[in-house]
């Protein structure tokens, strides 16, 4: 049931056709990325590297280090639009990149890759036979656009329109704020699911990618995902595709919190680090990035902690810019906004 509803959900909100067979439940997107990194690194002995388009989710960088998988990365800050293709190709041309990883919308910057940029990524992935791991944890959460209407344009942008070499990670904890149960779906394209890899057959006696992913990698990692969480996610997928659950409307509360807190940071001398999408102001959402004066990421993080403001350093996300990632998910009481205002006011007074 979950596989069927996941397939329908992806059609409803991405306008992408993926057979139920390829929609595979995982114990959260964390397990999805962990196992797909390992899978991709074993498809071709000549291709083991993971290419991260940064900034990104820090734990994914930790995952490849834990697994002993080599990686490369670059900060997208200076490589938007027509600059993106040549930069990615400079890595792929070496012939050792197994997979390209990014999130869209982006964690932590909340920038959103455009159709043209995704077309570029997809075409290069096809040309160099690399797999794109597209993390859609924040699917349809570019709140500048009227996304989230099932089976109606505009749809969430996705590399799935431009290559057959893709795996989509869809997170129940983010899309539906269903965090406690750890449930997600790794959606593998039909072509990639059926593809035979000699290296997999030699190593596991299972050559088809989709079969190997389920019967080797996921089985060894956890033996499966809890049935109760699968039933819950299936019900939410069904309700969303039926138009009964407005998950985008529910999540727009995070955009409201981001707008309010951004104004507070800006009022006290901070700046938005990743502030533009092709000349347009970046969307509001779960996360955004701020910097202050000439402070490095570590300096700003350490100083803000002294004033009772917690965040993570942009350095941990692979960013080459200086600043911190702000998360608004726990800003759920009116008095917290007043506390932030007062703490940043004192911070600014002490850092003139």
Task: State the predicted function of each range.
Residues 187, 289-291, 327-329:
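Short hydrophobic/aromatic beta-strand micro-patches
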Residues 1, 8, 12, 130, ...:
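N-terminal "arm"/small-domain region of PLP-dependent enzymes with the aminotransferase-like
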Residues 56, 227-230, 234, 247-266, ...:
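Conserved glycine-rich beta-strand-loop-beta hairpin in the small C-terminal domain of fold type I
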Residues 1-128, 133, 139-162, 167:
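Conserved core of the PLP fold type I
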Residues 131, 167, 287, 323-325:
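Structural preference for beta-strand elements that scaffold enzyme active sites
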Residues 4, 8, 12, 16-18, ...:
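PLP-dependent enzyme catalytic core of the Aspartate aminotransferase-like
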Residues 30-31, 56-58, 78, 105-108, ...:
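Short, solvent-exposed loop/turn segments at secondary-structure junctions
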Residues 161-252:
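Conserved core segment of the aminotransferase class I/II
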């Amino acid at each position: 049931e979950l596989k069927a509803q996941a397939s329908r959900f992806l059609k409803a909100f991405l306008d992408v056709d993926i057979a139920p067979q390829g929609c595979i439940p995982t114990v959260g997107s964390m397990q999805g990325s962990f196992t797909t990194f390992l899978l991709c690194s074993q498809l071709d002995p000549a291709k083991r590297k993971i290419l991260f388009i940064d900034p990104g989710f820090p734990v994914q960088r930790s995952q490849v280090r834990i697994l002993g998988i080599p990686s490369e990365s670059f900060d997208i800050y200076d490589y938007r639009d027509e600059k993106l293709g040549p930069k990615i190709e400079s890595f792929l041309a070496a012939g050792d990149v197994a997979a390209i990883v990014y999130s869209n919308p982006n964690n932590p910057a909340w920038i959103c890759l455009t159709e043209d940029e995704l077309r570029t990524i997809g075409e290069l992935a096809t040309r160099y036979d690399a797999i794109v791991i597209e993390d859609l944890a924040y699917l349809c959460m570019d709140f500048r656009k009227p996304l989230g209407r099932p089976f109606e344009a505009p749809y969430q942008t996705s590399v799935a329109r431009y290559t057959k070499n893709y795996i989509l990670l869809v997170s129940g904890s983010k899309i539906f704020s269903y965090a406690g149960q750890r449930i997600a779906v790794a959606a593998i394209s039909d072509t990639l699911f059926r593809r035979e890899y000699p290296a997999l057959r030699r190593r596991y006696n299972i050559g088809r990618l989709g079969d190997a992913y389920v019967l080797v990698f996921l089985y060894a990692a956890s033996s499966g995902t809890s049935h109760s969480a699968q039933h819950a996610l299936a019900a939410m997928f069904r309700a969303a595709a039926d138009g009964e659950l407005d998950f985008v409307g529910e999540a727009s509360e995070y955009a409201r919190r981001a707008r309010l807190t951004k104004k507070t940071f800006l009022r006290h001398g901070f700046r938005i680090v990743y502030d533009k999408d092709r000349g347009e102001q970046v969307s509001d959402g779960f996360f955004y990035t701020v910097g202050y004066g000439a402070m490095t990421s570590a300096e700003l993080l350490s100083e803000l902690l002294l004033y009772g403001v917690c965040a993570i350093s942009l350095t941990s996300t692979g960013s080459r810019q200086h600043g911190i990632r702000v998360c608004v998910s726990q800003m759920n009481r009116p008095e917290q906004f007043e506390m932030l205002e007062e703490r940043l006011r004192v911070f600014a007074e002490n850092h003139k």
